[in-house]
Every structure is written in structure tokens, then in C-alpha cells.
Amino acid sequence: MKTVNRFILYPALFVIAILLGACERIVITPSAPAPTIVIAPLLIEDTPLPSFVQPTSLPITPTIDPVYFRDEFDDVLGGGWTWLREIPGQWSLEKVPGSLRIAGGRGSVNAETMTNILLRPAPAGDFQIQTLLTFEPDQNHQFAGLVIYQDNNNFIQAGQAYCRGGGCVSRGIYMNHYGKGLIVPPNFAQVYKNNVVVLRLVRKGTSYIFEISGDGKVFYKVGSHESDMTPLQIGVLAGQNVDGISTTVPAVFDYFEVSSP
């Protein structure tokens, strides 16, 4: 009986010793205390916002489109146009799609006989008008181009023309200034025999500057006039055949643009 108890007792003591040793080696780390949530007072006035959300105090200047008006001469004329002495059968938006075609006949502005002058109100202050013109004049004084207009006695027209006589270069570029019904020289005539040209007429105060370009990017000054007229209307025109020949030469305007100079 004692032998049996010894065999039973020793293993039991051995197991107990192992368990006690393991207990000595196990370190029970207390769990971390739950985080304490502290609600701090708002410090909007005392604490600056991060720099990337700081509001700016600089005023924002709105972008101003330098183009006041542009007509591509597509299916119908843009708003604001009026015809002076219109002959409907002599102008078209269909014969050259995307362009205004005017059959330039006889008559002149100062004689109040030129037909189909297309005009719209001029902006206040400084401005410039521009068009791409295709024109091949071959009769004396035939003219097509831009016009800044007060009335039949006070206006400036600038474009391509054919002119014989004193101060003329036959086919070329011309700028005509009429003041109080009289032509004001010079006309800044320059030989130009290409059919296509970009015309630009600029108003700056009392100065009127005529520029041309072959590509619409680089412009060359033709000349300038001083005028105290009040520019009321702007637009395009074609005509001025004074030879009495019934032949008309079409002038084709690809677009008309009014913008800040």
C-alpha cells in the first residue's frame, strides 16, 4: 500500500512542481487602461487653420472676354445688325456657306448711293473691328472692307480697292477718311494683289489705325488718321464702282469681330 502511494505521490508532486514553476515564469501584463477621451474647448479664434485651407484676402478679378461680338456669318446674321439701303438679292449667306457675300455695285457712302452697307452699334470707348476679306477688284474705285461710321459725311473706310489716278496704286490697300463731307488725305495706298487679306481698324480716342495681316496673327500698320467724329456704327461694305459699268465684283467676308484693342 505504501509502495503504491509512493508511485502515485511522486508523479503528482512532479506535476505540481512543474505547474508552480510555470506560474513563476508567466508574467501577466495588466491590460492598458482604456483611453480617456477629453473634449477640448473649440479654439477657432486662437488656433490658425492649416495653411492649405487659409482663406485668402486678395480680391479675385473676374476674367473679361476681350471679344465684344463675333459673327461667323453662318445660317443667319447675328443680332444687332441693320442694313443701310439694302437690296436683298445682292447679298447672301448661302452662296459661300459660312461667309457673307455682298455683290459690290455702284455708289459711294458720301454720295448716299452705296447699297447693302451692313452696320451695328459701335461700342463706347476704344475698340477694334476685324474681318477676313476675299475680294478681287478690277474696276475703278471698286472697294470692299471695314467702316466706322457717324453719318454719310463723317466716316472712315479701310480695305482693298482698285483705283486709277493721282494718289492711287491700281489694285491695293486703301484707307479713306471723310470729315464733314470732304476727303481727308492721305489714303495710305499700298500695292496688294492677293485676293485674301485680314483687315483691322482700331479706334483709340480720336486716333483710327488701319492694320492688315496675311495670316491673322502678325499685323502691319498701314496708316492712321485723327478724327473728332462720334463713331455711332461699325460694319462692312462693298461697292463704289463709279465707272458706270454694271459688272459687280463680289466681296466675301468670312467673319466680323469687335474686340478690345
PLM feature segments, named:
Residues M1-K2, E24:
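N-terminal hydrophobic targeting signals that begin at the initiator methionine
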Residues K2-A12:
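Bacterial N-terminal signal peptides that target proteins for export
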Residues L13-A17:
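Hydrophobic alpha-helical membrane-embedded or membrane-associated segments
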Residues R25-I28, I37-P261:
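Extracellular glycan-recognition regions
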